[in-house]
Amino acid sequence: MQSNAEMTVTPASRPRLTRIDIARGVALIAMAIYHFGWDLEFFGYMAPATTAHGGWKLFARCIASSFLFLVGFSLVLAHGRAIRWEAMGKRLLQIGAAAAAISAVTFYMSPDNFIFFGILHQIALASVLGLLFLRLPSVVTLIVAAFVITAPFYAQSDIFNQMWLAWIGLSTVPPRSNDYVPLFPWFGAVLIGIAAARIFKRFNWLPILSGGIKPAFLQKPFTFIGRH
């Protein structure tokens, strides 16, 4: 996710948006809970495919959506006025290295279901593509988001069934992977985050996000997790 420096574009003029940190912290905790369930399933303590159906599947999709929404929102906060190429490049290298490591490790452990385009791969790609929307009107970004989210319902084709095109997300046969977060429809969540951040900036709503939460004792741990 975004670094501290990237989250605060002009620290002297705007307080840190604590509720963004808290939201990220909650998402990270939710991700840990889901992966704990996945581990229980993997080691035989839960029935096979438990986390791939029903409430667990919905839980996973909510987690991914929240992460990607925050990626888009934070992209505007960090680069909305001017793209900070050095910070962007450093962040992409970090995320790209982590994504490559996950692909390598999962290929070694489970070659039939390895993670070739998971959440980190999506974040890396979306962080680059999202730059194209930083100056566009929010309504245009939301229209594109709607197209991206709905495309898998009407734009699927056998052409995309080839493994090297699976990252796009328009194949007619879903590829096997332990974590699959393709461009379509998931980039749509990033675009919604970008549009939301631009709307918040336009109407001067960002100060709303600088407050805390109740109960207060949860604020510090959630904020710490979200920042680090």
Language-model features: locations:
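Alpha-helical transmembrane segments and their immediate juxtamembrane cytosolic regions
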Residues: M1-H228
